[in-house]
């Protein structure tokens, strides 16, 4: 499935196999836009597929996030001003579930601490401008991480994202990437 993806900020070291994408992050790679301290960074690694309508994207992510701001997960992007990224991130001295929504300005939503866990599954469903972000620790049970709005657009890009704003060299493995028509499930449905 990775053969339909194209880079924004291609990392120096990466390998796409039929079922797995391996990345070693470059130094100072990150995505933020007009944050609380005015920071703007558009240097993160994003391997996105183009889609023109609603979808469900899913991926398994393995990353050892150990420095402030390290992250790996899924991104949905319209342009530099309109995007969401969600996944494993290092915040407050521990790996956590994180999401960042950017509608001109970036926010940060911190989810559950992950402890020593370095792997999880992410799923993003986009239907008529509504984003449903789910995270799973086992690939079977999918609790809600975030429900948000993103402008309706003629084209989106969706796929793996990662970055290390304070360092380089984080190894990330993405697998089980899929892209399909949007799942039609109620918010309480954890499947």
Show which residues each predicted segment covers.
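Extracellular glycan-recognition regions
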Residues: 1-191
